[in-house]
């Protein structure tokens, strides 16, 4: 009974191994496929514009057909195909990285790293703030000087007005004094004239009597 079981066990094991071998997939794993091709878009120069030609921005990866796993399949051919696909993927990835590198270099504006770029931008921003603060201080000083000049002008106008009032008052006083002096002289002249008239009248009368 044991001798009969051994050949049966070997036969069952062979059948199972053949079924397992027939279900095994030795081909490469691919990304999501659409119509048998994998579409990957990139911008050759790294700068996307609306007028870029879509044909130049599209790469088509040829996908291999699913191959049945057979015991007598040429493994060297499979490996060569896998290496060809990997090589294409690497070349396409290199082009994508080149475009990304150009985009990054454009963003960095000639700097070697983002650190240097950020330090330069920070320095420029600090200088801009410093210049703005300096301009504000200068404007504040000019505003204060303008206020001081306005106060000086106001004080000068007030002083000139007061001086004019004082001068006018002095002129009026002097005019009044002169007027009073003239009045006194007029009265004196009137007295002298009346005195002379009296003397002339007396002399006339005396002369007529003679």
UniProtKB/Swiss-Prot annotation:
Homodimer; disulfide-linked. Seems to also exist as monomers. Pfam families: Fibin. GO terms for cellular component: endoplasmic reticulum; extracellular region; Golgi apparatus. PANTHER family: FIN BUD INITIATION FACTOR FIBIN, FIN BUD INITIATION FACTOR HOMOLOG. This is Fin bud initiation factor. It is found in: Endoplasmic reticulum; Secreted; Golgi apparatus. Essential for the initiation of pectoral fin bud formation. Potentially acts downstream of retinoic acid and Wnt signaling and is required for tbx5 expression in the lateral plate mesoderm of presumptive pectoral fin bud regions. Residues 1-23 form the signal peptide. The gene is fibin. Glycans are attached at residue 35. Keywords: Coiled coil, Developmental protein, Disulfide bond, Endoplasmic reticulum, Glycoprotein, Golgi apparatus, Secreted, Signal. InterPro entries: Fibin. Residues 133-157 form a coiled coil. Belongs to the FIBIN family. GO terms for biological process: embryonic pectoral fin morphogenesis. The keyword Signal applies.
């Amino acid at each position: 009974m044991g001798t009969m079981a051994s050949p049966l066990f070997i036969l069952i094991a062979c059948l199972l191994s053949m079924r397992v071998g027939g279900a095994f997939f030795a081909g490469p794993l691919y990304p999501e496929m659409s119509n048998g091709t994998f579409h990957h878009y990139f911008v050759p120069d790294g700068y996307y514009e609306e007028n870029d030609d879509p044909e130049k921005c599209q790469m088509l990866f040829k996908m291999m057909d699913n191959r049945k796993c057979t015991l007598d399949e040429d493994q060297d051919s499979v490996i060569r195909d896998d290496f060809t696909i990997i090589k294409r993927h690497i070349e396409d990835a290199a082009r994508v990285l080149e475009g990304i590198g150009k985009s990054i270099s454009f963003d960095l504006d000639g700097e070697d790293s983002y650190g240097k770029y950020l330090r330069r931008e920070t320095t420029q921003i600090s200088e801009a703030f410093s210049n703005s603060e300096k301009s504000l201080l200068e404007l504040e000083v000019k505003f204060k000087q303008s206020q001081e000049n306005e106060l000086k002008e106001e004080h000068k106008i007030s002083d000139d007005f007061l001086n004019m009032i004082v001068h006018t008052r002095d002129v009026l006083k002097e005019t009044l004094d002169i007027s009073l002096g003239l009045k006194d002289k007029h009265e004196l002249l009137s007295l002298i004239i009346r005195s002379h008239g009296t003397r002339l009248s007396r002399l006339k009368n005396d002369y007529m009597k003679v």
